[in-house]
């Protein structure tokens, strides 16, 4: 519990109030809660103050656009309403105070970049558990103690949700947490008051331009994690063009590369010298500031070599002995919906992956090719009401790397599926190897029944998701379940 006057440094109210939780959604308010009314992109929380009071809110903090109103207190009945200037910007700091700075008592690692955030955050938590920690994770798949993850709405939750979750993890015994930090979360200051032991940058490719408007804005949002927030250790993928540029500006950052010829300069470093890919993963010979060795990876694809090196480098920077990391790496497992392989005797191999950007799709197809002796199939779609510019680019990638392509439905939302297909098809030079099957289950069925034993079918776009968003309705759908049904 936190007292209202202590939270806002207010002069003593006549009757100070003890608050149980901070709540942004008026529908979730309970007696004793502090309702936070901020102006979001779609709705203004101030419109729901009456609803929050009806549900028993003990106090309200309300965003105001007038600096002169900052920390003034009004009353609705007996309930104090504290006006707060630029509340959304400062909400992370307020929640940090409310929940007693939970990130100070956790080893917190933030992971940002277009692709790889989920795999890296999950691997960090998994590896920390193997090293004897109680780990938690927050991100696209969900939030919770490792092995007890609950589905989440957004990659990076609200400023309040993040602080309250970290507090809950701490009280549940966690001492290590990895969190995916999205560009939206950074641009909207949702992680502003967190204390990061380390931050990892994976890569930057086209995504979310419907929100950021330009790649420059997108990169600037990501960069804040390394230049403006409380981040101790910075681990950067040097093979990414933006990452390489940032390394020239961040002399204390650690450089990680898959290029044996990478010139390390003055940075601490990790680089792969030789990589042997095989059906069960890869064997990575590496050299680093912490020593040399061979890392046995259970993950498929070159991009997962990069992901694993970024994770191991971060743990090495924390002081874990190299020999301990190499020994425990053998027990690591893949991540749900991330290059997840499904195999049955005498059937084509199916790989389910979350790839939903041109770069991610290219990397997934290249990785799938390494395990393909026959034809490579690609099933994909593009989300509705989202960046239309990437749709023809996805088609170009699929046409370049796959022999057979099926365009299908992938969360059309309120947009016409035929319009989405038209945008995608504009990227193909030749439609001979392309089929359009809007029903995703039928698309998967057709591919599995048409492909032969040595073929590989990449089902891209949904990964761990078990739903389709059609109109405003969320319908149960799992690529894995459908694939298994038709493979059996």
UniProtKB/Swiss-Prot annotation:
GO molecular function ontology, one term from the record: UDP-N-acetylmuramoylalanyl-D-glutamate-2,6-diaminopimelate ligase activity
Residues modified to N6-carboxylysine: 222
Ligand binding (UDP-N-acetyl-alpha-D-muramoyl-L-alanyl-D-glutamate): 24, 26, 41-43, 154-156, 182, 188, 190
GO cellular component, one term: cytoplasm
Motif window: Meso-diaminopimelate recognition motif: 410-413
Primary localization: cytoplasm
E.C. no: 6.3.2.13
Cofactor: Mg(2+)
Keyword Nucleotide-binding among UniProt keywords: yes
EC class of the enzyme, as a word: ligase
GO aspect biological process, one term: cell wall organization
Subcellular location, record wording: Cytoplasm
Pathway involvement of the protein, from the record: Cell wall biogenesis; peptidoglycan biosynthesis
Keywords per UniProt: ATP-binding, Cell cycle, Cell division, Cell shape, Cell wall biogenesis/degradation, Cytoplasm, Ligase, Magnesium, Nucleotide-binding, Peptidoglycan synthesis
Positions with a binding annotation for ATP: 113-119
Residues noted as binding meso-2,6-diaminopimelate in the record, renumbered to the chain: 386, 410-413, 461, 465
Superkingdom of source: Bacteria
One Pfam family linked to the record: Mur_ligase_M
Alphabetized InterPro entries for the sequence: Mur-like_cat_sf, Mur_ligase_C, Mur_ligase_C_dom_sf, Mur_ligase_cen, Mur_ligase_N, MurE/MurF_N, UDP-N-AcMur-Glu-dNH2Pim_ligase
PTM notes: Carboxylation is probably crucial for Mg(2+) binding and, consequently, for the gamma-phosphate positioning of ATP.
Catalysis performed (reactions): UDP-N-acetyl-alpha-D-muramoyl-L-alanyl-D-glutamate + meso-2,6-diaminopimelate + ATP = UDP-N-acetyl-alpha-D-muramoyl-L-alanyl-gamma-D-glutamyl-meso-2,6-diaminopimelate + ADP + phosphate + H(+)
Protein function: Catalyzes the addition of meso-diaminopimelic acid to the nucleotide precursor UDP-N-acetylmuramoyl-L-alanyl-D-glutamate (UMAG) in the biosynthesis of bacterial cell-wall peptidoglycan.
Family note: Belongs to the MurCDEF family. MurE subfamily.
Protein name as it appears in the record: UDP-N-acetylmuramoyl-L-alanyl-D-glutamate--2,6-diaminopimelate ligase
Designated gene of the protein: murE
